[in-house]
Amino acid sequence: MASTFRLQIVTPSRTFYDDEVEMAIVRSTEGDLGIMSNHMLMVAPLKIGKVRIKKDGQFREAAISEGFVQVESEYTRIITDTAEWPEEIDVQRAEEAKERAEKRLSASQGEIDRLRAEIALKRALNRLSVANGK
């Protein structure tokens, strides 16, 4: 059996995940990070994306928003605004959010409006990707 470490995924509203895992893969601002037991200590900012969790030889994905990953000797903690399993994602709501963001992007007047619309679109596309298993 592969060596494991404790993975915690925490949002402002709940502890989304807390268990022993073999590996976690997250998207940092510098690219994908594969974290395993005895990984070097670090803190890194995360982009909107998926977290892939390997437990008992099987991978499971969840959608996460921006945040941070903290790798310590005893655990790894992901702190993010939101985290959702595929079955928790309301696909219709995500589709509507995507459409709203696309409309806001095409009609945006200022830089801040455009940036907000881009972030909203990334979140919606990420949620849809995880919900659809892509």
UniProtKB/Swiss-Prot annotation:
It is found in: Cell membrane. Transmembrane segments: none annotated. Disulfide bonds: none annotated. InterPro entries: ATP_F1_dsu/esu_C_sf, ATP_synth_F1_dsu/esu, ATP_synth_F1_dsu/esu_N, ATP_synth_F1_esu_C, ATPsynth_dsu/esu_N. It is a peripheral membrane protein. GO terms for molecular function: ATP binding; proton-transporting ATP synthase activity, rotational mechanism. It holds the Pfam family ATP-synt_DE_N. Gene3D superfamilies: ATP synthase delta/epsilon subunit, C-terminal domain, F0F1 ATP synthase delta/epsilon subunit, N-terminal. Keywords: ATP synthesis, Cell membrane, CF(1), Hydrogen ion transport, Ion transport, Membrane, Transport. HAMAP family: ATP_synth_epsil_bac. F-type ATPases have 2 components, CF(1) - the catalytic core - and CF(0) - the membrane proton channel. CF(1) has five subunits: alpha(3), beta(3), gamma(1), delta(1), epsilon(1). CF(0) has three main subunits: a, b and c. Produces ATP from ADP in the presence of a proton gradient across the membrane. This is ATP synthase epsilon chain. It comes from Alkaliphilus oremlandii (strain OhILAs) (Clostridium oremlandii (strain OhILAs)).
